[in-house]
């Protein structure tokens, strides 16, 4: 039931005194008082709609990337409310992690206090944007009432065999002094957070078996038709499913010693001239000969200092040393040397590859560098020619120099050789994945404690659920000197085993913060549940999320982990769906104007550039490059949202950021365009000011009653045109806000409608004008919610504009009495004529032939052919 809203006697503004701060603050208070943004209890048969932005890390400072993300989601949420849906639009905070811990170390403060302070600051900044967020559902991952359930879910995964601990070679960040998952190491071998070159270390770590879901994660991408193709491709490539064969090479002279390699090209087995192990392969130590021991040890030490990118870069030389062992090629009995090389990685496949230099580029480069044999076994198709000596032939073809398999095509040979090897026990078909199990251990303080106890007698023991949450100790030393800070807190570490009662100790690693963000969308549906993380029936009503909005940089981190979590929880019968997000919108970056000195790579503050038309470095005088790049402090190109809102208001900021570029494209910040949106809103104010209802029995009529049944039989031409423009706008904007969302073109349609109404409201009946303004204000409400509310009040609308129904097209208003018909002569456009909209082909032919255009251009000739495209053109061919 709608509560009373301010009457028309309440304050309203004209363009002459438009004060956006006063207006927006007033309406935000009113919305809060009315509780308009709370998630309603859905009525019977009412459709639910879940709109969600990727929740932010609470840095304490809102940036324009945040603004774009949250405003896009807010528009979608507001539209769906007006369409009659029960809408869930929550917000929370991804609040654990290294930045807060590092800030706490630098400032000697508690990271919890620091984080809560930042949350309060950012919430106040978000409130200024007029976002229709249900703050009653707010969650922060660092709060005990949230991470209790992260621990509960970890124990569910542990009980299902999906969480385990093992010794592993891990990615160590020497700056942040913690372990990183593979996904958190960039293509240059650097930490995604600190930028440090990542090192390799052996540590006992906790993992989640995401690889158990590799096939489901890649196969189900086909069902995500509401996701950008680019994101689906990135995930498929990261999972990296390859079909091939495992080949067993027996080590010569060593009983029961086998080197197993995975290859996608078993057809090239006859061309193998060596086998290569990763330097970290467990057999390197035992198979290295005494003569090669020093060289192998030195090489392994060298490789341990290199990043993955350095080891696998195509433009780098391929380095390696022989270890002094030989293996036997099972298909032909040849003896092949065993090497170690930088380009073979321990965590891909078996950590061993067969070198086939004639048909693999890396093997070719390696063989040329180390004078190893290059044997061609695949001939180019449909030719007697082999590949050029200067490169490997990696394509398909026909087998040669392959014994009984000569003449087979590549695909035939893959099957035949694998089948033959399987019959002899040295080969089997195999599917291999690039994806590795998710490493979740972190050796830092500010994270969710892993709810595990280690007992000398009982082994790994889960913390009983009734003892959750395992809370972080407070007031501890956060020196940042390596290792887990909580490992030094003996009073916290030492506990009794829940099973045997003997002395035991807690797990001192904390969880990767992506654990917390892999399920938060579920908690929003049931945020106050004190018995479970969520109720299955409730989440099944609201989820999957209908529209998820966030950056593409999360394609193979958060989005992949969230999909895994959803599938795992489904299999534990905790939820009834297998994918978390039905539709995904990945908004582009907000870029700022940047001045860069190309000679030295330095960035120059715009404040130091005296002439925009000829920008120069103030010190060197060098001409500067003018670029648009992602906003950052180091590039002096950031724009503070608070400054923009203080000057122009939230509605202007929203309109600019939505209009400037399609949501999935990068947006170039332009102060002049911000000013342009401010002027447009002022024009709307003047338009609304130009209309006034007549007095009726001392009362102002209401625009709500103007949802109006309009008799189209006796409308004037002006009225027909106004109704057509109004309903064309409904049609276009509704289309723009459905499916692939195009917010920029929706605002463009708003501008068209505004222009078509300007100066014409007094030329039509009040009912027609009121209908047009009612539609205009409702269409603009999701974009500029404060001004729309003000307009609705001024036009005597009942209740809030945001409680009104989305406008519906009147098809009769779109019917044209006449249309414009193009006249062509010999295919060239010669003019246009007006014809009845329902004219048949015969009528169109007569009208075209009798037109002045035809008389002029046919010059008395009769056309041999007449081509008619109804509703578009007539082509006369003499």
Swiss-Prot record:
Pfam families: Anticodon_1, tRNA-synt_1, tRNA-synt_1_2, tRNA-synt_1g. One of its GO terms (cellular component) is cytosol. It catalyses: tRNA(Leu) + L-leucine + ATP = L-leucyl-tRNA(Leu) + AMP + diphosphate. ATP binds at residue 633. InterPro entries: aa-tRNA-synth_I_CS, aa-tRNA-synth_Ia, Leu-tRNA-ligase, Leu_tRNA-synth_edit, M/V/L/I-tRNA-synth_anticd-bd, Methionyl/Leucyl_tRNA_Synth, Rossmann-like_a/b/a_fold, tRNAsynth_Ia_anticodon-bd. CDD domains: Anticodon_Ia_Leu_BEm (cd07958), LeuRS_core (cd00812). Keywords: Aminoacyl-tRNA synthetase, ATP-binding, Cytoplasm, Ligase, Nucleotide-binding, Protein biosynthesis. PANTHER family: LEUCINE--TRNA LIGASE, MITOCHONDRIAL, LEUCYL-TRNA SYNTHETASE. This is Leucine--tRNA ligase. The lineage of its organism: Bacteria, Bacillati, Cyanobacteriota, Cyanophyceae, Synechococcales. The gene is leuS.
């Amino acid at each position: 039931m709608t509560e009373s809203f301010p009457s028309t006697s309440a304050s309203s503004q004209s363009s002459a005194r438009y004060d956006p701060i006063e207006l927006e603050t007033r309406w935000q208070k009113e919305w809060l008082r009315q509780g308009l943004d709370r998630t309603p209890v859905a009525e019977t048969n009412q459709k639910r709609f879940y709109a969600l932005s990727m929740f932010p890390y609470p840095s304490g400072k809102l940036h324009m990337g945040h603004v774009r993300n949250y405003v896009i989601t807010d528009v979608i949420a507001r539209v769906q409310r007006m369409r009659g849906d029960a809408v869930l639009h929550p917000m929370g905070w991804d609040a654990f992690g290294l930045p807060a811990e590092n800030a706490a170390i630098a400032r000697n403060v508690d990271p919890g206090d620091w984080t809560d302070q930042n949350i309060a600051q950012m919430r106040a900044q978000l409130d200024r944007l007029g976002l229709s967020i249900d703050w009653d559902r707010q969650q922060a991952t660092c709060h005990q009432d949230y991470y209790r359930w992260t621990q509960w879910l970890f124990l569910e995964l542990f009980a299902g065999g999906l969480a385990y601990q093992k010794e592993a070679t891990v990615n160590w960040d020497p700056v942040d002094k913690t372990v990183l998952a593979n996904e958190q190491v960039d293509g240059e071998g650097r930490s995604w957070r600190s930028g440090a070159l990542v090192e390799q270390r052996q540590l006992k770590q906790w993992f989640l078996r995401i690889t158990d879901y590799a096939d489901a994660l890649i196969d189900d991408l086909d069902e995500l038709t509401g996701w950008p193709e680019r994101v689906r491709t990135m995930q498929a490539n990261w999972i990296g499913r390859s079909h091939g064969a495992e080949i067993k090479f027996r080590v010569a002279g060593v009983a029961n010693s086998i080197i197993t390699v995975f290859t996608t090209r078993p057809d090239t087995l006859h061309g193998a001239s060596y086998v290569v192990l990763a330097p970290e392969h467990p057999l390197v130590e035992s198979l290295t000969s005494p003569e090669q021991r020093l060289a192998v040890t030195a090489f392994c030490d060298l490789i341990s200092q290199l990043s993955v990118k350095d080891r696998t870069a195509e433009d780098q030389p391929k380095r390696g040393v022989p270890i002094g062992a030989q293996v036997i090629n099972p298909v032909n009995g040849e003896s092949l040397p065993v090497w170690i090389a930088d380009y073979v990685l321990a965590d891909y496949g078996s950590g061993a590859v067969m070198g086939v230099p004639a048909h693999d580029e890396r093997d070719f480069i390696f063989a040329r560098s180390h004078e190893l044999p290059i044997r061609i076994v695949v001939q180019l198709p449909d030719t007697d020619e082999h590949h050029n000596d200067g490169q490997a032939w990696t394509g398909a073809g026909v087998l040669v120099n392959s014994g009984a398999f000569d003449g087979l095509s590549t695909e035939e040979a893959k099957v035949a050789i694998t089948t033959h090897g399987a019959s002899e026990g040295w080969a089997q078909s195999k599917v291999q994945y690039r994806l590795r199990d998710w490493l979740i251990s972190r050796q830092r303080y500010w994270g969710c404690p892993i709810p595990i106890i280690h007992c000398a007698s009982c082994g790994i023991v889960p913390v009983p659920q009734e003892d959750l949450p395992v809370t972080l100790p407070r007031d501890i030393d956060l020196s940042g000197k390596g290792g887990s800070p909580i490992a030094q807190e003996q009073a916290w570490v030492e506990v009794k085993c829940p099973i045997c009662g003997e002395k035991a100790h807690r797990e001192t690693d904390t969880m990767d913060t992506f654990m917390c963000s892999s399920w938060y969308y579920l908690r929003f549906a049931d945020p106050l549940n004190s018995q479970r993380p969520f109720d299955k029936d409730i989440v099944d009503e609201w989820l999957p999320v209908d529209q998820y909005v966030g950056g593409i940089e999360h394609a193979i981190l958060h989005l992949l982990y969230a999909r895994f979590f959803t599938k795992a929880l489904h299999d534990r019968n905790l939820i009834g769906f297998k994918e978390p997000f039905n539709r995904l919108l990945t908004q582009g970056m907000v870029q700022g104007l940047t001045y860069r000195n190309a000679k030295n790579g330095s960035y120059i503050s715009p404040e130091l550039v005296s002439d925009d038309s000829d920008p120069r470095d103030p010190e060197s005088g060098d001409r500067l490059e003018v670029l648009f790049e992602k906003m950052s402090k180091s590039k002096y190109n950031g724009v503070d949202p608070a400054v923009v809102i203080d000057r122009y208001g939230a509605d202007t900021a929203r309109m600019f950021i939505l209009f400037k570029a399609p949501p999935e494209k990068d947006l170039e910040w332009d102060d002049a365009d911000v000013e342009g949106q401010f002027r447009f809103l002022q024009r709307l104010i003047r338009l609304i000011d130009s209309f006034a209802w007549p007095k009726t029995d001392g009362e102002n009529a209401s625009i709500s009653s103007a949802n109006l049944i309009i008799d189209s039989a006796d409308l004037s031409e002006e009225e027909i045109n106004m109704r057509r423009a109004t309903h064309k706008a409904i049609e276009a904007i509704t289309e723009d806000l459905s499916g692939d969302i195009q917010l920029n073109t929706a605002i463009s349609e708003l501008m068209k409608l505004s222009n078509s109404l300007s100066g014409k409201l007094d030329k039509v009946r009040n009912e027609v004008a009121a209908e047009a303004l009612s539609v205009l204000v409702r269409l603009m409400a999701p974009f500029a919610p404060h001004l729309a509310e003000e307009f609705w009040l001024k036009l005597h609308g009942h209740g809030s504009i945001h409680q009104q129904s989305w406008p519906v097209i009147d098809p009769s208003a779109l019917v044209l009495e006449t249309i414009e018909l193009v006249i062509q002569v010999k295919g060239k456009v010669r003019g246009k004529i007006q014809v009845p909209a329902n004219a048949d082909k015969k009528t169109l032919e007569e009208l075209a032939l009798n037109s002045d255009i035809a008389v002029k251009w046919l010059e008395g000739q009769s056309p041999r052919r007449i081509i008619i495209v109804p509703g578009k053109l007539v082509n006369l061919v003499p």
